[in-house]
From Swiss-Prot:
It catalyses: a quinone + NADH + 5 H(+)(in) = a quinol + NAD(+) + 4 H(+)(out). GO terms for molecular function: NAD binding; NADH:ubiquinone reductase (non-electrogenic) activity; quinone binding. Keywords: Cell inner membrane, Cell membrane, Membrane, NAD, Quinone, Translocase, Transport, Ubiquinone. This is NADH-quinone oxidoreductase subunit D. Its EC number is 7.1.1.-. It comes from Roseobacter denitrificans (strain ATCC 33942 / OCh 114) (Erythrobacter sp. (strain OCh 114)).
Length: 407
């Protein structure tokens, strides 16, 4: 009796014999959002396995932090998620303030909220427009980056730097905002909804955009709990989990805002959630500006004491202040021994810092919880069974940045 398989194999063409093959996606692929390398096992166009390789941007941040003072460590946080730098600084400052028991002045707290929401919009503009570009729409990035440029100028006017601001400080913020800047931010916040509407009109009901995103990369509630997702990845699946509401920090409990949630947990729902979050952030920005202008919003922006420098006028008249200033910037302040976890609702998810202090002027150990790291580990689970073209859409809505993933 003849073995039928032999004849079948002979009938296969050369192309059919190599249907199952491995390809490298990245690390210099434009849709890889940084230095991501995916090793994909494909069956024709269908992804059978996806293996993310990370570490190409590893700089040993956590180890470097152990040999720097607390203040010198602050700029490292700008370089983690460099799309929305101030949100990362916020977590570091909160961790130090928890251990030292410092009370942040009300005005500084409101300025922090204002710039955290500006950071959220910076992040979501970049994410939505590059997501559109990944699936073939080239107009949104041109509109979005024009708005990001305006926000970068606000960063520069507040701190002197467009990107790596180092503006938040343990105990408050570096300096007060000029009144003209607050006016300009308010003017911008009234104009920006028009841009959101333009992008909305271009993408939301667009047939091609919908086909490329709907029912792609679905995340269930079980996935969320198993993989430790946070941020938009959770809210896109219908769970209203937001640290600003669930565990209010700074003064978010004084603000009135909604938490947008999706229904299906796919790429399209995550896009819709980000669009609505930008509108909610604008509402928070306008509320923060109103509070900053109110009489109770006036005052100092730093909790003057051991961990913050004295004012310039004090240093001109008091020798103690001058000595304090010198010691603060040479030796640095000492943080009481203990351990603490502080987290913020960063644009990408829950960004946390687990800080272990040993009573010296340098941290004993600092562990950074980057939301993107936990999202990327589910890449295999989310892309399995999808087409190769869908991999770019899934990475896009995961919102990964390799500064924080590789750290």
């Amino acid at each position: 009796m003849m073995d039928g398989t032999k004849g079948f194999e002979d009938a296969l063409t050369g192309e059919q014999k190599i249907r199952n093959f491995n390809i490298n996606f990245g690390p210099q692929h434009p849709a890889a959002h940084g230095v991501l390398r995916l090793v994909l096992e494909l069956d024709g166009e269908i992804v059978e396995r996806c293996d993310p390789h990370i570490g190409l941007l590893h700089r040993g941040t956590e180890k470097l932090m152990e040999s720097r003072t607390y203040l010198q460590n602050l700029p490292y946080f700008d370089r983690l998620d460099y799309v929305a730098p101030m949100n990362q600084e916020h977590a570091w400052c909160l961790a130090i303030e928890k251990l030292t028991g410092v009370e942040v002045p009300r005005r500084a707290s409101l300025i922090r909220v204002l710039f955290c929401e500006i950071g959220r919009i910076l992040n979501h503009i970049l994410n939505i427009t590059t997501q559109a570009m990944d699936v073939g729409a080239l107009t949104p990035p041109l509109w979005g980056f024009e708005e990001r440029e305006k926000l970068m100028v606000f960063y520069e006017r507040a701190s002197g730097a467009r990107l790596h601001a180092a503006y938040f400080r343990p105990g408050g913020v570096h300096q007060d905002l000029p009144p003209a800047l607050i006016d300009d931010i308010e003017t911008w916040a009234h104009e920006f909804p028009r841009v959101i509407d333009d992008i909305d009109g271009l993408l939301t009901e667009n047939r091609i955009f919908k086909q490329r995103n709907a029912d792609i990369g679905v995340v269930t509630e079980e996935d969320i709990l198993e993989y430790g997702f946070s941020g938009v990845m959770v809210r896109g699946s219908g769970l209203a989990w937001d640290l600003r509401r669930a565990q209010p920090y700074e003064r978010y409990d004084e603000f009135d805002f909604q938490i947008p949630i999706g229904k299906n947990g796919d790429c399209y729902d995550r896009y819709l959630v980000r669009m609505e979050e930008m509108r909610q952030s604008l509402s928070i920005i306008l509320q923060a500006i109103a509070k900053l202008r109110a009489p109770e919003g006036q005052g100092d922006v730093l909790a003057r004491g051991k961990i913050t420098p004295p004012s310039r006028s004090d240093m001109k008249t008091s020798m103690e202040s001058l000595i304090h200033h010198f010691k603060l910037y040479t030796e640095g302040f000492h943080v009481p021994a203990g351990e603490v976890y502080a987290c913020v609702e960063a644009p990408k998810g829950e960004f946390g810092v687990y800080l272990v202090a040993d009573g010296t002027n340098k941290p004993y150990r600092a562990k950074i919880r980057a939301p993107g790291f936990l999202h990327l580990q589910a890449m295999d689970h989310m892309s399995r069974g999808h087409q190769l073209a869908d991999v770019a859409a899934i990475i896009g809505t995961m919102d990964v940045v390799f500064g924080e993933i590789d750290r």
